[in-house]
Amino acid sequence: MLGVYLPIIVLVAVAVIFGLASLTFSSLIGQKKPSAVKLAPYECGCEPVGSARERFSVKFYIIAMLFILFDIEAVFMYPWSVLFKRLGIFGVVEMGLFIVILFVGYIYVWKKGALEWE
């Protein structure tokens, strides 16, 4: 039983060891000379304008959450579409219920005005 999972365990161990070794060596070897230029926020090579600690509207976060929600919907629908014939009527009903729940949530968000940009 362990033989089946041994390659995955080795892969995870190598990844963790490599990550920790990279962090350790970079902190030991890297230069630690902070200056005002190094601590300034980077804006695509342009001179920084204003403060980097600016507040954003909540609407940006709502749109981001909706994007993630519908991205997850696509993640669930892809395997369902691949296994469509094997799942039978149960799979169709289950995915239909999932889409209806998402659609009701979308209508709720729309009625609340979260998609209105003013």
From Swiss-Prot:
InterPro entries: NAD(P)H_OxRDtase_bac/plastid (IPR023043), NADH_UbQ/plastoQ_OxRdtase_su3 (IPR000440), NDAH_ubi_oxred_su3_sf (IPR038430). This is NADH-quinone oxidoreductase subunit A 1. NDH-1 is composed of 14 different subunits. Subunits NuoA, H, J, K, L, M, N constitute the membrane sector of the complex. NDH-1 shuttles electrons from NADH, via FMN and iron-sulfur (Fe-S) centers, to quinones in the respiratory chain. The immediate electron acceptor for the enzyme in this species is believed to be ubiquinone. Couples the redox reaction to proton translocation (for every two electrons transferred, four hydrogen ions are translocated across the cytoplasmic membrane), and thus conserves the redox energy in a proton gradient. The chain crosses the membrane at residues 1-21, 60-80, 87-107. It comes from Geobacter sulfurreducens (strain ATCC 51573 / DSM 12127 / PCA). Its EC number is 7.1.1.-. It catalyses: a quinone + NADH + 5 H(+)(in) = a quinol + NAD(+) + 4 H(+)(out). Belongs to the complex I subunit 3 family. It comes from the Bacteria. The gene is nuoA1. Keywords: Cell inner membrane, Cell membrane, Membrane, NAD, Quinone, Translocase, Transmembrane, Transmembrane helix, Transport, Ubiquinone. It holds the Pfam family Oxidored_q4. GO terms for molecular function: NADH dehydrogenase (ubiquinone) activity; NADH:ubiquinone reductase (non-electrogenic) activity; quinone binding.
